[in-house]
Amino acid sequence: MEKQRSKKTKISDDLITCSGNSVQIPFDLIPEILKRLPVKTLARFLSVSKEYTSIIRNRDFMKSYLINSSTRPQSLIFTIAGGGIHCFFSLIDQGESTSSSKPTYLMNCPHLQLKTFAPSVHGLICHGPPSTLIVSSPRLIVSNPSTRRSIILPKIDANHECIYHHMGYDPIDGDYKVLCMMKGMHVYQRRYLAKELQVFTLRKGNSWRMVEDFPPHCLCHEDTPDLCINGVLYYVAMLDTASNHAVMSFDVRSEKFDLIKGGPDGDLNPKLTRYEGKPALLFPGSDYRINLWVIEDAAKHEWSKMSYDVSSTSLIRNPYFHHCVFCTNDAGEIVLAPDFVRTKTFVVLYYHPKKNTMRSVVIKGIRDRKIPLWDEASYHRIISVFSGQVDNLMFL
């Protein structure tokens, strides 16, 4: 009994002492050690002592942990639907050194009336009803795949209107804000004016707040993702009188809007992504072409336009012709994946535009999860693929 006691850890105001080995660690070094540990380990530490709990739940520590996590190699996060279940998987890209990989299962969301086209915003994902669904008082869910926990936001007074939603992060205050827009007057085809914009602050808010001043614009396709870079939320919009795509920017901290004009025209379904640190629109062209429009100067509405012919790459052959463009990764590669998965494996393609090379990675194991309805589905749909998934301690 005495031997067991000697191995216990004693925590004081200035030292942590491991008596059995006579090791003393200054208390101010403990946060530096803890923020290098995985989320699962920190979750177990919450039951060790009140001192550990106070450190891990401290807001400054959580912000520091997130910053430290963002410096590590970031993974792709897949949202895959099957049998009415949405499952989240992460995949760490090993580069050209690997030809196959098994993604890590994160969590599932068994909600039939939820759509997830939103990316991971500093580790959190916001999902809710599709914009085509009329709900009197819709509710959005914010999930943390790292902790496998979610919170339900307060009801939105939508007045029986369809809604669009986006989430951004303010790196200065460490606040997450969810932006919700009502679908207003029908303008043309699938275009509706945005009206009654509301904001919810994740840490502080108990209710939604109205945003009074915003430029008139039309909401775009519901499966067009948003993007948050350096405290600015971007989402694809359209001008009310033209066919040109535009990008709306929303400063998460100041809650100011700015419309970036000059995007591609036509009935496209572009993917908003990050390319070399800048927001960009990614969309397929004809004859095996991939188009990339990068916002070079938002204030001047300046874009650079690139088009890549991938027909010469050896991997653009059957059965990969049906792959869809999803996003870009940190290496500047364009990520392509199939819309539907009907077998135990599928292939993800990575196209490097500067090198004009294509590599493939065989993805295994997504059908191995024994989840009711999920493993019984005859096929699974890849709803979204995004880069930039990081570990986050919120909701731990």
From Swiss-Prot:
Residues 19-65 form the F-box domain. It comes from the Eukaryota. PROSITE patterns: FBOX. SMART domains: FBOX. SUPFAM superfamilies: F-box domain. Signal peptide: none annotated. NCBIfam families: F_box_assoc_1. PANTHER family: BNAA05G37150D PROTEIN-RELATED, F-BOX ASSOCIATED UBIQUITINATION EFFECTOR FAMILY PROTEIN. This is F-box protein At2g21930.
